[in-house]
C-alpha cells in the first residue's frame, strides 16, 4: 500500500527527552497512561535482535522468573512472541509503522545498511519528495529529515532526525493508517487521555514521550493480531480501575484484567474499533529498570 501525502509530510512531534531516558519508561512519571511496548510475532528472534539491538542500539534484558528476553529502548520495550511466524508485515494493517528519533540520521541509515537491512524510503514517501541516499529531506521549512527501514519479517520503521536530541535513540511515534483516521484519533484521545494535536499533515495525539499519528488510507486496512506487530501496549496506573471504566464506557475487554506473577505485572487487552490489538499493563516501568 503506497502511503498518502499525509504520511510523508512528516511534521512530526519532536519528542523531548533527557539523558536519563536510558532507564526505560521514564515518561511513566509524567502521566497516568504512557506508551509501554511493541509486541512482535517472530520466527527469527536472532534477526530481530540484530536489528533492534545491534543496529538501533537497544539493550537486551531478561525479565521475570522465566528470563523473558526483551529489548529496552528509551520509553519503549519490545517483546517477542517467539516461534510464531507472522502472517504479514506491518504495512496494510492499522499500525503501518513504528518510529524512532535519532540525532544523526545519516549515521543511523548507514548502520542499517551496513548490517544488511533494507532502506525503503523511496517507496514510502510521496513521489515528488526528494530522496537522496535513502534520506528524505524536510517536507517544509523547520521539518525533519526522515528515512524508512524494513526490519525483519516486514516491520516498517521510520527514523526521524532530531539534532537537538541528547541520547542516541528514543521512541518517537506509532503511526496508524485508517480510512477514518480522524475518528480513530478521537477514539484514542477519549480512551487513553492523549492530547489532541491538529494543524500538521495529519491528526495526531500525544502521550508523555510519544506521538500517536493518524494518516488517512485510501485502501482498506486489516487488524494487527497475527501480523509482525501483533499488538501495541500502554502502561496504565491503577489498571484494574481503568478496566472497570472501559467496561462502563462500553468497551469490551478481549482479555480481562489479571495479574502475571511471573513478570510481576498486571495486564488486560482490548481491541480498538478498527482491529488494533492493544495490551494494557501495570508494572512494566518497574520490572524493566
For each feature predicted by the language model, list its residue ranges.
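Vicinal oxygen chelate
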Residues: 22-31, 109, 113-176, 197-207, ...
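Eukaryotic phosphotyrosine signaling hubs
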Residues: 35, 94-97, 228-231
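Mid-chain, structured segments of secreted extracytoplasmic proteins
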Residues: 65-117
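N-terminal secretory signal peptides that target proteins for export/translocation
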Residues: 1-2
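Bacterial N-terminal signal peptides
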Residues: 6-20
Amino acid at each position: 500500500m503506497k502511503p498518502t501525502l499525509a504520511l510523508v509530510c512528516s511534521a512530526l512531534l519532536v519528542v523531548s527527552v533527557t539523558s536519563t531516558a536510558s532507564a526505560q519508561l521514564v515518561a511513566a512519571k509524567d502521566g497516568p497512561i504512557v506508551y509501554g511496548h511493541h509486541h512482535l510475532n517472530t520466527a527469527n528472534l536472532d534477526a530481530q535482535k540484530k536489528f533492534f539491538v545491534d543496529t538501533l542500539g537497544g539493550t537486551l534484558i531478561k525479565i521475570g522468573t522465566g528470563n523473558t528476553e526483551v529489548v529496552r529502548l528509551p520509553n519503549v520495550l519490545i517483546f517477542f512472541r517467539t516461534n510464531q511466524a507472522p502472517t504479514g508485515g506491518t504495512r496494510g494493517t492499522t499500525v503501518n509503522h513504528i518510529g524512532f528519533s535519532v540525532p544523526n540520521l545519516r549515521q543511523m541509515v548507514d548502520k542499517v545498511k551496513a548490517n544488511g537491512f533494507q532502506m525503503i524510503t523511496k517507496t514510502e514517501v510521496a513521489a515528488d519528495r526528494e530522496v537522496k541516499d535513502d534520506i528524505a529531506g524536510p517536507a517544509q521549512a523547520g521539518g525533519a529529515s526522515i528515512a524508512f527501514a524494513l526490519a525483519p519479517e516486514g516491520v516498517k520503521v521510520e527514523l526521524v532526525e532530531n539534532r537537538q536530541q541528547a541520547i542516541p535513540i528514543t521512541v518517537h511515534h506509532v503511526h496508524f493508517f485508517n480510512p477514518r483516521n480522524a475518528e480513530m484519533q478521537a477514539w484514542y484521545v477519549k480512551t487513553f487521555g492523549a492530547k489532541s494535536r491538529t494543524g500538521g499533515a495529519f491528526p495526531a495525539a500525544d502521550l508523555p514521550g510519544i506521538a500517536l499519528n493518524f494518516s488517512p488510507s485510501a485502501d482498506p486496512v486489516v487488524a494487527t493480531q497475527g501480523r509482525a506487530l501483533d499488538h501495541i501496549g500502554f502502561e496504565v496506573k491503577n489498571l484494574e480501575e481503568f478496566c472497570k471504566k472501559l467496561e462502563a464506557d462500553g468497551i469490551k475487554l478481549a482479555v480481562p484484567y489479571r495479574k502475571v506473577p511471573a513478570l510481576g505485572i498486571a495486564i488486560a487487552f482490548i481491541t480498538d474499533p478498527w482491529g488494533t490489538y492493544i495490551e494494557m499493563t501495570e508494572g512494566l516501568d518497574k520490572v524493566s529498570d
